[in-house]
Amino acid sequence: MTSDRSDRTVRFDQIRPDTPVDAAVRLRAFALSGRPVSLDTMSPEALSELISAIAHDLVAQGKAGDLTDDLIPPVDKLTVMRPKDRAHGDWASNIAMQLAKKAGMKPRDLAEPFAAALAEAEGIESVEVAGPGFINITLDSASAAAVVDKVLAEGAAFGWNGHLGGETLNLEFVSANPTGPIHIGGTRWAAVGDSMARVLEANGATVVREYYFNDHGEQINRFAKSLVAAAHGEECPADGYKGAYIDEIAQRVIDEAKADGVDVLNLPRVDGGVDADGNPLGEGDSEQREEFRKRAVPMMFAEIRESMKNFRVSFDVWFHENSLYEDGEVERAIADLRERGDIYEKDGATWFASTNHGDDKDRVIVKSDGNYAYFAADIAYYRNKRHRESNPADVAIYMLGADHHGYIGRMMAMCAAFGDEPGRNMQILIGQLVNVMKDGKPVRMSKRAGNVVTIDDLVEAVGVDAARYSLARTDYNTPVDIDLDLLASHTNENPVYYVQYAHARACNVDRNAADAGITHEGADLALLDTEADGEVLAALAQWPALLSLAGDLRAPHRVAHYLEDLAATYHKWYNVERVVPMALTDPEERQDDAAREALRIAKNPEPARAAARLKLNDAVRIVIAAGLDLLGVEAPERM
């Protein structure tokens, strides 16, 4: 049984990150994979495939009224959900209510033949039609537990798929100016962007992680002016950069230049002169400022790279804006648009006719004084991403801050002007603000950077794991408050601690089982038949669809939410089901005979059941570790 990919392509711009889970699952990407879905695990995806096949069979048999094959929705829109009440079964479908009107039948009348066909499927214990036409499905224990064998066989790759394969996604994130340390907003993009890249790769995509250094233009000039002022002990310029890091870098420039035989403080500070390459300096420049710029910007680059490395974020490409000018790419991009009829001259300036492609106004790209507008580099950069020799992007994903919302129109217009499809070849994600809190009050000050909190400040306060997890677990469209006190605590209210503790607890169960001589070799998974067992099995079965959905929605926060739900289910299971025999406590020994015997049975499972539970325990451990790794967070074995 295979899926027709061409009928089920889900475009990114057709699914919003805030789509509710139940609705989004109807668009889940497993139906996009074009690969057979094994029914031996009877996962939600397998049930959807089975229900689709039954629908077509009922049409062929004339048992579905006026329904025809073309009226049956694709598999990804056939909802299979987890009932809130376990008494209603393991899974439920509303297929009969979806199709009843098209079939010209009452929902319950259409549900009956569906239920009869489902009841004959291997791995299904019982099927019941309930209410107006819901179909409740109960799996047999062995079928429900088959997911455990699948997890142990596939390991950390369980749930990975190839439905985003065949395309190269260029994911640009952080891209902070090299004028200071990474601030808290950039830190959020580092956590979200790297996690997103990992999730996309788990869905088969080829991902190019890219950092764009804005090392051209006025901000770099302001940075250099600030350094010169600091080097001379002068007040920072009104539009300059402040903070202890400015003093530090200024001194490093002085020391480095001195080692090279250059007395940087005695270079001319007046306008004019030439730069390091012998080119005339423009108005507002000076030899001294150019020397500071030339030496300080690489220092800032190095510091940013080190911060990213310490945050477990790596990039495939570190792209320098200045190279677009040096290599003539800006001129070539403008020439390309001119050939396409989207460039004109007016008032001594060169304009991009972006209104031809949906923007609210045309944009200047070469000012009347002959200098390039900032947007000129944006145009050249997108063209470079799409047509570079190494790993050209099929999809260019930009992760921008909240202050860039006004850029979307012009960026999408530029995409369309090059003959590409906005929302398809270019995707823009806008992130919201981060507030850092301590003792219930906002934290505004950094040791080095003045009135901002930096990536290094956050890591020093709570560690990499807590920092990354807390920033990645919230939808980037939503402002987030980072509570330093909470993240430093070892309590269940701390989400990263709660998930990591579930992994450490599972590892501890393994150690105790080994000490007790318990293994899961030859375990009979049909013995996983309690309500708590079933909840854990169902949670594991939902991981593949959730992972696929997170990739389609560009939503790594869904991985974190899944892990928290799985951890909660596991902790509950751990508290009621035993793997390793446990002696009764003194208060328990003093209970009446019947109560004491019930406790003894609960705390001392027979060997076969203990082996099955140990295997389930290991499956949970594997999935939690894999999920944490997608978020760049470690899975400790002891806590």
Where are the regions a protein language model picked out?
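Non-catalytic interaction-recognition regions
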Residues: 2-145, 152, 156-158, 163-639
